[in-house]
Curated annotation (Swiss-Prot):
Pfam families per the UniProt record, alphabetical: Ribosomal_S14
UniProt-listed PROSITE patterns: RIBOSOMAL_S14
Disulfide bonds: none
Protein name as catalogued: Small ribosomal subunit protein uS14
Amino acids binding Zn(2+): 24, 27, 40, 43
Keywords: Metal-binding, Ribonucleoprotein, Ribosomal protein, RNA-binding, rRNA-binding, Zinc
InterPro entries, alphabetized: Ribosomal_uS14, Ribosomal_uS14_bact, Ribosomal_uS14_CS, Ribosomal_uS14_sf
Assembly notes: Part of the 30S ribosomal subunit. Contacts proteins S3 and S10.
Cofactor(s) it depends on: Zn(2+)
Source species taxonomy: Bacteria, Pseudomonadati, Thermodesulfobacteriota, Desulfovibrionia, Desulfovibrionales
Organism this protein belongs to: Oleidesulfovibrio alaskensis (strain ATCC BAA-1058 / DSM 17464 / G20)
Keyword Metal-binding attached: yes
Function: Binds 16S rRNA, required for the assembly of 30S particles and may also be responsible for determining the conformation of the 16S rRNA at the A site.
Amino acid sequence: MSRTSLEVKAKRKPKFSARAYNRCPICGRPRGYMRKFGICRICFRNMSLRGELPGVRKSSW
């Protein structure tokens, strides 16, 4: 199935709640999803490096 059809399928309410899973709303990626921000790790990295996520900065120690 194409990515867009899988995104539409994921948005529907499943018959059983255990079947529901999160997808990144930007790219549609099902893995590496960060609940706190609601996006995948790759989109999180891109947005944080561009400064689009307030309060997030690159760590340094």
